[in-house]
């Protein structure tokens, strides 16, 4: 099926599917959250007065997952199976925290497990800083710890900004669009599909989070942690760019560019 579609059609259809799934499941997920008392209750630090469903992350995750599974060619990107497994693990950690409010230590341990699956299983880590701070090629002894700390830190940074309506999802969409356009023009189509799918999956949540009244939902840790993880994957892949590429794909000091793109959460 995928072999019959051009890369452009795969990209368009993956985004359309993620958008449609997110839009159509938002109401059932909202009702399920109310029924199961899966809500964020107001406290002294809350800006909302009533109980708001904490299930927006479920909408984003399911929409992205369906798009990712149906349109990405895993045979061309073997590391994607570990990206998917890591994202699922971190999503489940977030769901568990949203429901039971686990300790920060346990939550971070779960995040670390998801990141380790990606690094160890997928061999996915930094190998070159492209002149950032005058460093170029780095050994795995440096690249693996740097990737590990960077991913765990970014996951929690994204989670921390998920306190204002539309901020986390809005920033994530901007970052995804930047990375997605770059991946597309540089020929990294599978990563462009990941960026496009996540952007489209975030749109329905962004609208109901920012403009919803009776159907308002929060993203919750399940969504924020998973989005942070996927943004980290995009950032690492961006940093692993071939420094000899020309035109729009040529990136000097790629980690510095990543810091600029992710400036607000970081």
Identify the meaning behind each predicted range:
Residues 2-5, 30-61, 95-113, 135-139, ...:
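Interhelical loop and helix-boundary elements at the membrane-water interface
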Residues 39-49, 67-77, 126-136, 152-161, ...:
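Short juxtamembrane and helix-loop transition motifs at transmembrane-helix boundaries
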Residues 2-32, 37, 61-88, 92, ...:
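Alpha-helical transmembrane segments
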Residues 137-147, 252-256:
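Membrane-interfacial loop-to-helix junctions in multi-pass transporters
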Residues 53-69, 116-121:
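A generic, lipid-embedded transmembrane alpha helix
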Residues 45-47, 87-89, 145-146, 151-153, ...:
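Short hydrophobic "helix-edge" motifs at membrane interfaces and signal-peptide entry regions
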Residues 88-93, 110, 114-125, 146-156, ...:
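Membrane-embedded alpha-helical core segments of multi-pass
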Residues 128-140, 245-250:
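Interhelical loops and loop-helix junctions of multi-pass membrane transporters/channels
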């Amino acid at each position: 099926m995928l072999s019959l579609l051009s890369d452009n059609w795969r990209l368009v259809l993956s985004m359309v599917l993620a958008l449609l799934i997110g839009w159509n499941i938002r109401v059932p997920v909202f009702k399920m959250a109310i029924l199961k008392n899966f809500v964020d209750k107001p406290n002294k630090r809350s800006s909302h007065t009533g109980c708001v469903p904490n299930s927006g992350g479920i909408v984003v995750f399911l929409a992205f997952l369906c798009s990712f599974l149906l349109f990405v060619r895993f045979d061309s990107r073997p590391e994607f199976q570990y990206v998917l497994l890591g994202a699922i693990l971190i999503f489940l950690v977030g769901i568990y925290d949203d429901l039971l409010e686990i300790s920060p230590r346990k939550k971070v341990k779960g995040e670390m497990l998801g990141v380790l699956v990606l690094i160890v299983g997928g061999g996915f880590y930094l190998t070159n800083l492209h002149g950032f701070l005058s460093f170029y090629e780095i050994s795995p002894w440096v690249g693996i710890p740097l990737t590990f700390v960077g991913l765990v830190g970014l996951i929690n940074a994204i989670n921390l900004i998920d306190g204002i309506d539309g901020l986390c999802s809005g920033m994530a969409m901007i970052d995804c669009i930047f990375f997605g356009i770059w991946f597309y023009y540089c020929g990294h189509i599978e990563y462009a599909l990941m960026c496009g799918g996540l952007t489209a999956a975030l749109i329905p949540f962004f609208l109901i989070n920012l403009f919803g009244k009776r159907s308002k939902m929060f993203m919750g840790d399940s969504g924020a942690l998973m989005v942070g993880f996927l943004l980290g994957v995009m950032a690492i892949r961006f940093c692993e760019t071939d420094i000899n590429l020309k035109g729009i794909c040529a990136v000097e000091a790629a980690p510095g560019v990543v810091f600029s793109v992710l400036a607000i959460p970081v």
